[in-house]
């Protein structure tokens, strides 16, 4: 069986200054060849980058309920615990704007049931741990604290997408500079920059575990992004060594 020739991959190309010998159609059909609008020389390169962003927010919900023979008793029981939770959170450095309380009151046969849910948003995960540990220690089993739900704000995701794209552009520019330097030219301004692909995914390696540490939950919720761009740069004339003055 004949040996297969290795496939050559063109990652950058230079257009000659005088391209009249080649037809425009031939140039456009060749991978990596770019036809300059004004007959100038250009270099076209690809660039890629990959970054990750850990979640910047977490939400914990604290459920409180009480069933009593009278409505006043049920409301009073829940209200006392809500006041303690609010006081503990304030002392733990949580501001009012990050606390949301919802209440529901029901009559079941001869009893009254009062339920309340306190949802708390944390941007400091050390505060999250210390506040939750304190509430678990101080409150009885009638209070249920949900596992933290980690997520990304829109600003965090936009920053990740912007930075990974800029990283890909920077890598493409470095590649173009190296190509130009190799052939004795210098790199000019960017003519075209186009993002070809943007991918995002999460690390699901440990998501099936029933009980995870805070660090494992953060790792599982981390979002990864990869960007690939194509860029065309102007090529300047050959480099000349500066004369010593």
Curated annotation (Swiss-Prot):
It is found in: Cytoplasm; Nucleus. It comes from Xenopus laevis (African clawed frog). This is Interleukin-1 receptor-associated kinase 1-binding protein 1 homolog. Keywords: Cytoplasm, Nucleus. GO terms for cellular component: cytoplasm; nucleus. May be part of a signaling pathway that leads to NF-kappa-B activation. The gene is irak1bp1. InterPro entries: IRAK1BP1, SIMPL/DUF541. Belongs to the IRAK1BP1 family. Pfam families: SIMPL (PF04402). GO terms for biological process: immune response; positive regulation of canonical NF-kappaB signal transduction.
